[in-house]
């Protein structure tokens, strides 16, 4: 299957690589099929590209690479909807936003993306009863001062 992307060009994707979001993603409820594109093999960064809209992709971040204490509880209903189990564990991502400088990047802790890779099902979960922010600065001031301009 060929997918057009303004960011990545033409992608040749196998049907089993497509992650289905039955409820869409808040703000993009009509978009129900995406492909997950790792940045590099061991990178905590990746992308979620719409299969239908060439200009719709999200920067995803592995939260545990930057915020090891990040945690939340999925309801039994949500775990059931995503068909999660010991054999089908969740994969969790945060949507990131890059500002003018990479050191000002923020992530949405309040609405993680939860994916069952084995079943190719995903959902953006909006957490309640939490102090998490939708604009959590990814790099602390200490880490930011160690990162050269341009993020290299």
UniProtKB/Swiss-Prot annotation:
User: What SUPFAM superfamilies is this protein classified in?
Assistant: BH3618-like (SSF141457)
Q: One GO CC annotation, please?
A: cytoplasm
Which InterPro entries has this protein been placed in?
Flagellar_assembly_factor_FliW, Flagellar_assmbl_FliW_dom_sf
Question: Which Cys pairs are S-S linked?
Answer: none
What highest taxon heads this organism's lineage?
A: Bacteria
Q: Which key words are in the record?
A: Bacterial flagellum biogenesis, Chaperone, Cytoplasm, Translation regulation
> What does the UniProt entry say about where the protein is found?
Cytoplasm
| Keyword Manganese attached | no
A GO biological process held by the record: bacterial-type flagellum assembly
Alphabetized HAMAP family for the sequence: FliW (MF_01185)
Q: What family does the database annotate?
A: Belongs to the FliW family.
Subunit structure comment from the entry: Interacts with translational regulator CsrA and flagellin(s).
Its function, per the record, reads:
Acts as an anti-CsrA protein, binds CsrA and prevents it from repressing translation of its target genes, one of which is flagellin. Binds to flagellin and participates in the assembly of the flagellum.
Q: PANTHER family, per this entry? A: FLAGELLAR ASSEMBLY FACTOR FLIW
State the name under which the record lists this protein: Flagellar assembly factor FliW
> Which organism is this protein's natural source?
Desulfitobacterium hafniense (strain Y51)
Origin organism lineage: Bacteria, Bacillati, Bacillota, Clostridia, Eubacteriales
């Amino acid at each position: 299957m060929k997918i057009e992307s303004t960011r990545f060009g033409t992608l040749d994707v196998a049907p089993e690589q497509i992650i289905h979001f039955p409820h869409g993603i808040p703000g993009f409820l009509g978009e129900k099929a995406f492909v997950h594109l790792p940045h590099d093999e061991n990178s905590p960064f990746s992308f979620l590209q719409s299969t239908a809209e060439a200009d719709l992709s999200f920067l995803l971040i592995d939260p545990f690479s930057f915020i090891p204490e990040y945690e939340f509880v999925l309801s039994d209903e949500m775990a059931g909807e995503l068909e999660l189990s010991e054999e089908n564990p969740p994969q969790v991502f945060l949507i990131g936003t890059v500002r003018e400088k990479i050191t000002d990047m923020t992530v949405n802790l309040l609405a993680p993306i939860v994916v069952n890779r084995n079943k190719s099902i995903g959902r953006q979960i909006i957490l309640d009863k939490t102090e998490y922010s939708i604009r959590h600065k990814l790099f602390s001031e200490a880490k930011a001062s160690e990162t050269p301009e341009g993020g290299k």
